[in-house]
C-alpha cells in the first residue's frame, strides 16, 4: 500500500473513531449522571443540555419503531462501507462526507441496538429544532460535505460543470 493511501485511510479511520468515541462518551456520561428530561447545563440564550431518549429518527419520525430504525441504521452503515470499497473515492470532500455519515449513523445505531432509543442532549434555544447529539452533528456535516462535493468537485459523467 502506498504511503499516500495509508495516510488517506489513517485520517479517515482516525476521524471516524474520534467521532464515535466522543459520541459514546457523552451519551454514556449523560445516561449515568442525569435523569430523562433533566437540564444539566445551559449556555444562556443559546442552548440547554438536557437528557432526552428519542425512540424515533430525525424529528422523531417513526417513533417507537425501534426494530425498523435499527435495521435501517445498520443497513445504512453497511451500505456506506460497501460504497467506499466499491467506488474507492479519492477526493477529500467525498471521503469526508462518507466518514461523517458513517460515524454519525454508527453512533446512533449503537444506541438503537443497545438501548432501543437514541440519547439526545443538545437543545438550541433560539431555533425551534429537535434535541440532537454529536452523531447527528456528524450526519448533518456529512450532508454539507456531500453537497459541496456534488456542487464543486464531482466530475462524473452527467455532472460536469
Protein language model regions, located:
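Alpha-helical transmembrane bundles and membrane-interface segments of multipass inner-membrane proteins
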Residues: 1-161
Amino acid at each position: 500500500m502506498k504511503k499516500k493511501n495509508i495516510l488517506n485511510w489513517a485520517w479517515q479511520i482516525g476521524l471516524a473513531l474520534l467521532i464515535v468515541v466522543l459520541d459514546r462518551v457523552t451519551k454514556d456520561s449523560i445516561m449515568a449522571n442525569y435523569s430523562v428530561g433533566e437540564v444539566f447545563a445551559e449556555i444562556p440564550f443559546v442552548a440547554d443540555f438536557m437528557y432526552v431518549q428519542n425512540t424515533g429518527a430525525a424529528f422523531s419520525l417513526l417513533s417507537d419503531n425501534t426494530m425498523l430504525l435499527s435495521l435501517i441504521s445498520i443497513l445504512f452503515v453497511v451500505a456506506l462501507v460497501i460504497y467506499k470499497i466499491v467506488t474507492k473515492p479519492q477526493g477529500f470532500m467525498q471521503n469526508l462526507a462518507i466518514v461523517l455519515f458513517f460515524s454519525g449513523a454508527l453512533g446512533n445505531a449503537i444506541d438503537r441496538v443497545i438501548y432501543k432509543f437514541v440519547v439526545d442532549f443538545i437543545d438550541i434555544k433560539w431555533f425551534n429544532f429537535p434535541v440532537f447529539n454529536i452523531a447527528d452533528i456528524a450526519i448533518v456535516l456529512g450532508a454539507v460535505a456531500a453537497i459541496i462535493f456534488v456542487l464543486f468537485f464531482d466530475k462524473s459523467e452527467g455532472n460536469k460543470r
